Amino acid sequence: MFRVLNDDVYSPAEIQQQNPLAFGKASSLFTDNRSANDQCETGENVRESGQDHVKRPMNAFIVWSRERRRKVALENPKMQNSEISKQLGYEWKRLTDAEKRPFFEEAQRLLAVHRDKYPGYKYRPRRKRKRQQKLLPADSSKLCKQMHIETLQPFTYRDGCANTTGSRMESQLSLSQSVTITNSFFQNEHHSSWTNLGHNRVTLATQISADFPFYQSLQPELSCAYFQY
């Protein structure tokens, strides 16, 4: 079966000589596929998306605006469709009832034809599909907004601002340096005062111990009174 269908190896004449029945099946298979491809290309037996959709009958304004829209578009080729629609609505409101009457009559005639052609017609408006938006968590969304604002609105320095910023930075730097120097000075003074105080205490104790025999030679009541605390 696979040898029969392989056209690259065997020609149609060889296939017919080897197995005429298989050639008939293969040819019918090729013709069926070709007809199916033709149907796909021409759109036969394929249900189109708008095949079942029936248009609404035109009202008086649409009947009037069809021809008027073409004229306005030809007169103003650069005008957008939305602007043309606004102009047509304004012009339609300015028309009198006598001027609108022929278009209402034409709309009634088209409505009667539409009822005869589609007796069970009911207007069914198409529903608009709602797009699902994936929302980020609150914290991450706020962070993204902040990052977006920072990237879109960078801070630009001007000459005056740069000078002011530089002077502020220099003043802050000098202030921090002065505070550091003052702190180091107080620390050194505090350390030196404690060192001097300790040294004075040692000197005083040494001097008292050296002079102790002299105080003992004095009267006992004076020596005791001197060393009472």
Swiss-Prot record:
CDD domains: HMG-box_SoxA_SRY. Coiled coil: none annotated. InterPro entries: HMG_box_dom (IPR009071), HMG_box_dom_sf (IPR036910), SRY (IPR017253), SRY-related_HMG-box_TF-like (IPR050140). PROSITE patterns: HMG_BOX_2. Residues 54-122 bind DNA. GO terms for molecular function: calmodulin binding; DNA-binding transcription activator activity, RNA polymerase II-specific; RNA polymerase II cis-regulatory region sequence-specific DNA binding. This is Sex-determining region Y protein. It comes from Przewalskium albirostris (Thorold's deer). The lineage of its organism: Eukaryota, Metazoa, Chordata, Craniata, Vertebrata.
